[in-house]
């Protein structure tokens, strides 16, 4: 009998309050997993992190230097980490909170056009943007009076 997977085997998580380790950019992206450099570069390109990689390099230490990065860069590092974890489902909590509209739109187009399965919590949106999602649960519909 096969043992059921654990929660961490099924889900990867990215939030508006990213966890950044006092380690290299590479470690923060991969958590030490054996991931091909080409795959990491591809995800960095899609999430608009490639300029950071080219400027600082993967060995850039994010200890005290993390405060030199923008909130949007930190969120994108955590999102890249979640994607690179290669879990069946991504749980995304307000991943665009610190992103400008253009970057947010580009990242959402990447996610929507990918084969990734994700559940996303969003609070601020335009109704026309929601038409691209497979399903929507509006928690206001379940609010008790």
PLM region spans:
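ABC ATPase nucleotide-binding domain signature region
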Residues: 1-34, 122-124, 130
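Short helix-terminating capping/connector loops at secondary-structure junctions
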Residues: 7, 53-55, 92
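ABC-family ATPase nucleotide-binding domain "signature/switch" substructure
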Residues: 17, 28, 61-145
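Conserved "ABC signature" C-loop
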Residues: 18-61
């Amino acid at each position: 009998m096969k043992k059921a997977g654990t929660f961490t085997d099924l889900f990867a998580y990215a939030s508006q309050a990213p966890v950044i380790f006092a380690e290299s950019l590479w470690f923060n992206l991969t958590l030490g997993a054996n991931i091909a450099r080409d795959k990491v570069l591809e995800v960095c390109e899609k999430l608009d992190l490639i300029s950071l990689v080219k400027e600082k390099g993967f060995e850039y230490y994010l200890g005290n230097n993390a405060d030199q990065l923008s909130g949007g860069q930190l969120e994108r590092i955590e999102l890249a980490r979640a994607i690179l974890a290669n879990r069946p489902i991504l749980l995304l909590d307000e991943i665009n909170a610190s992103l400008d509209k253009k970057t947010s739109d580009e990242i959402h187009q990447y996610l929507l056009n990918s084969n990734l399965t994700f559940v996303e919590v969003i609070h601020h949106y335009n109704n026309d943007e929601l038409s691209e999602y497979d399903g929507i649960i509006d928690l206001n519909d379940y609010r008790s009076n």
